[in-house]
Amino acid sequence: MRGLFRVFALLAACAVGAAFAQSADDLFTAVKIDNLRGVRNLVERGIDPNANDAAGDSALTVAIRSDASNVAAFLIAHPEVDPDRRNNALETPMMLAAFRNRLDLVEKLIARGAQVNNTGWTALHYAASAGNVEIVKLLLEHAAYIDAESPNKTTPLMMAARGKHRAVCDALLEEGADPSLINERDLSAAGFALRAGDRELADLLEKNAAAWRSRHPPIR
């Protein structure tokens, strides 16, 4: 009799686990199609809004990737949602919103208290890579570190140069970005621009780098 009870308990636990997994799958399905009512109902039923999918993305990250604007706004505003939750690639929702040119979502994330700065790649790197001057300026207004270094010491200015985004380079230089920095691949911002085939931008960046070095001579 006791053994039979254990079997029933095990079956019940399996059923609960399967139901939870199915509900989590339902959450991500609703997120991807921007089904706000469905997402709200699932969260109200107790589904964790911070749960990750099989790829390691949270519901908020999936919403941003899927351009599910209504769901993304709902999740950003939800008090239980972690606005800084990273995925397996260590990307935050703000980084992805910046890369996808979603100024509106970046603004919402900042208002929600999401971190503008973090170690490694940052939202400013992603905005510079996307060539979005508005987001770059917004992040700088909220104290984004202008010379933030990726794990291999690549800066936002280098990413802007890599994408041949002249307007972003100009904005970063105007705000004081250091064009003389070199990453671990021995590339400066000018070097990135040259590799991208934009000699005019490379010359501009090298000129600025020379001026920077003259103003900031090495301490001996």
What are these regions (language model features)?
Residues L4, A19-R45, A54-D57, A73, ...:
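Intrinsically disordered, low-complexity regulatory segments in ankyrin-centric signaling systems
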Residues V7-G17:
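Bacterial N-terminal signal peptides
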Residues F20-D26, H142, E175-D178, E184-R220:
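Ankyrin-repeat-protein effector appendages
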Residues T29-D34, V62-A68, L96-R102, Y126-N132, ...:
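Ankyrin repeat A-helix N-terminal signature
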Residues R37-G38, N70-V71, D104-L105, E134-I135, ...:
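Conserved ankyrin/ankyrin-like repeat signature
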Residues V43-D48, A73-D82, E107-A114, K137-Y145, ...:
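Ankyrin repeat domain, specifically the short helix-to-loop turn at the C-terminus of the second helix
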Residues A51-N52, P83-R86, Q115-T119, I146-E149, ...:
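Ankyrin repeat boundary signal
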